[in-house]
């Protein structure tokens, strides 16, 4: 009788334990489903596109960007889909032939219509930003600049995209957008999170400074460390992803690579004789004829303009780096500084801080000299040595050594190498701080430059506050999923064991 009673009690208890285990299993399953659904809400795929045309002084580039619509407030999600270089010079050269601008832009715009799905055409914004070449044209003739922009707008409006305007951006904007681009792509606007807890350990990351060198201007932009920006016109305030940034930026018009060369020629031709300029910034044996009207055809050379007894002059290269370097330094006025410290031409420059990303012509010139040196890392001292050796080579030997490089670019590499060294010296970079410069062509398959930052700003894709993140940090989410899964497995094994061998369970329990 006792045995029967005992057996009933055990069966009753086993049944209750199985019910409890079953209930626990249900709770674990519900928890797994709840965490999974909360963390991974199903979202329809929705890709957006944007087009930016960089109308520079020497050429125009078109960039197509794409990004997942549901993540457009996250940092680093925009990808460069395509880059198309428009065939021909910069748009400022079309001031007297604006009727040709439509054909000039056609090839790259047609490519855009092919690459972007037809269903997305009407919602794809198109922006054109013109830089220093058009700034110079506007200085010469505001009417001509307006006519060029009007012709550009007419052409771009004829395509099935959402044309948002063509404008001349300021040097300050160009510097700021370049700074935004490289830090966005490098993920420097996000906060670092701890994987140990549910609470984020917010830590503002160091941003990169930006060094941009174009054909007609150069920009330097960075966040100074504990330093007052003494010239208000060089100070910009940003609030990005919940963090405040005080940024120093300045654009030196006429100090882009091409215009700096024109300045140097205009300066040096004044002391030449007989219409021949022996130029240390070109390889020995190199010769070129230059029209005086072309030399003085830019506002950048007006300060050196004087009546010359000839209409043309001949450049004869002598290939002397030291003399070239000295001639370039004469373009930088260091005689007066109204601030605690300056770069050149009396422009305030706070103490350099942190790492810098150098792009555009900085990158292209350095990339060439890295190939010359057969080394991916070049110190300032090594760069000086390589440039000196390159300049001293005869023009014939240089052409033979680099047959794949266009002669126009090859002939100017001696000057370009010396100019970059001189310009960075003007920016107060030393042997040690040179090591903090990273020469960047692309970051994560996107070109380093101002265009992406320009689009991000105009489409409001960089929020002032940190966007809402998933309910749980990724590591915590994984941990909870594993915990509930293990609990579910443990409950299932225990329940199965009790169900199949109840007598063994109770014997062990007793």
Curated annotation (Swiss-Prot):
Extracellular side: 38-478
Transmembrane residue ranges: 17-37, 479-499
GO molecular function: ADP phosphatase activity; apyrase activity; ATP binding; ATP hydrolysis activity; CDP phosphatase activity; CTPase activity; GDP phosphatase activity; GTPase activity
CDD domains, alphabetized: ASKHA_NBD_NTPDase1
The record's account of how the chain is modified after translation: N-glycosylated. The N-terminus is blocked.
Enzyme class: hydrolase
Locations listed in the record: Membrane; Membrane, Caveola
Keyword line: ATP-binding, Calcium, Disulfide bond, Glycoprotein, Hydrolase, Magnesium, Membrane, Nucleotide-binding, Transmembrane, Transmembrane helix
GO cellular component terms listed in the entry, alphabetical order: basement membrane; caveola; external side of plasma membrane; plasma membrane
Positions of disulphide bridges: 84-108, 254-300, 281-324, 337-342, 391-414
Membrane topology summary: Multi-pass membrane protein
Active site: 174
Ranges per topology, Cytoplasmic: 1-16, 500-510
Catalytic activity, EC: 3.6.1.5
Catalysed reaction equations from the record: a ribonucleoside 5'-triphosphate + 2 H2O = a ribonucleoside 5'-phosphate + 2 phosphate + 2 H(+); a ribonucleoside 5'-triphosphate + H2O = a ribonucleoside 5'-diphosphate + phosphate + H(+); a ribonucleoside 5'-diphosphate + H2O = a ribonucleoside 5'-phosphate + phosphate + H(+); ATP + 2 H2O = AMP + 2 phosphate + 2 H(+)
PROSITE patterns per the UniProt record, alphabetical: GDA1_CD39_NTPASE
Protein role: Catalyzes the hydrolysis of both di- and triphosphate nucleotides (NDPs and NTPs) and hydrolyze NTPs to nucleotide monophosphates (NMPs) in two distinct successive phosphate-releasing steps, with NDPs as intermediates and participates in the regulation of extracellular levels of nucleotides. By hydrolyzing proinflammatory ATP and platelet-activating ADP to AMP, it blocks platelet aggregation and supports blood flow.
Self-association and partners: Homodimer; disulfide-linked.
Family, per entry: Belongs to the GDA1/CD39 NTPase family.
Protein known as: Ectonucleoside triphosphate diphosphohydrolase 1
Organism in which the protein naturally occurs: Mus musculus (Mouse)
